[in-house]
Amino acid sequence: MDAGVRSTVKFRTTSIALIFGIAVCATFSLAAQKKPAATPVPVVFAQDKGRLTIKLGGQTVGHEEFEIAPSGGGWLAKGVAEIKPPDGGSSKVSGSLTLQPDGAPISYDWSAQAEKTNGAHILFANGVASITLQMQGARPFQQDLTFNTPLIAVLDNNLYHQYAVLARIYDWSKRGVQSFPVIIPQELTPGTITVQSTGSASADGKTYEGLKVTTSDLEILLLLDGNHRLMRLEVPDAKVSVIRD
């Protein structure tokens, strides 16, 4: 499979009001005192669902169906991509990422079907990603990757909706350059990315909000609508374009 399609990244992060202290006054009346409510965890996500067309050198090589939705007390971002490059065999990859409302990952499962079927389950806790990898015909392999923060970006091969998740994790109130640790699960690769708002950007006669993602060897441009939904993704050096249908 062409390297540009195989991976766009190669190197590879209730409010409970406390009522306490019942005070007894001289006449034995009771008064409940209430502490200020704890600051609620911010919710950075919005429900989204769509289909992406994946192009390499202007030629369609695959599609991805995805959905980002509330799940329990958190959020679930899941997608399935089918890739068939002109000079290689077809493959199918799926990913399911469970997240805290603030964007920190809780767990991730992926499965890739090509000549063999491989997959993994990852649990995130206290900045540690505990990975159990299952390769067809091999014993399960376990590995831990340690990060210095629980807010880790998960950007897996050929699952471009995960850049929509990244666009939500980016702090738009601060803007500027923001760095995130990142994990590429199918490659067991950790690394660091920087994300920066580029302001207004245009493509095919349409205007978007631009967000630039920089890795050690690639620049990825995310084009978002006014609600920061991913509409288009461009990787110029790899000649990859991903366009929402």
Regions found by a protein language model. Give the residues of each.
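Solvent-exposed helix/loop surface patches that form functional interfaces
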Residues: 40-47, 61, 114-209, 234
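Bacterial Sec-dependent signal peptides at the C-terminal "C-region" and cleavage site
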Residues: 27-37
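Bacterial N-terminal signal peptides
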Residues: 17-27
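Short, exposed beta-strand-loop hairpins at the edges of beta-sheets
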Residues: 213-214, 220-237
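N-terminal secretory signal peptides that target proteins for export/translocation
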Residues: 1-12
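A short, Trp-centered hydrophobic/proline-enriched beta-strand micro-motif
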Residues: 46-54
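N-terminal mature ectodomain segment of secretory-pathway/periplasmic proteins
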Residues: 55-135, 228, 233
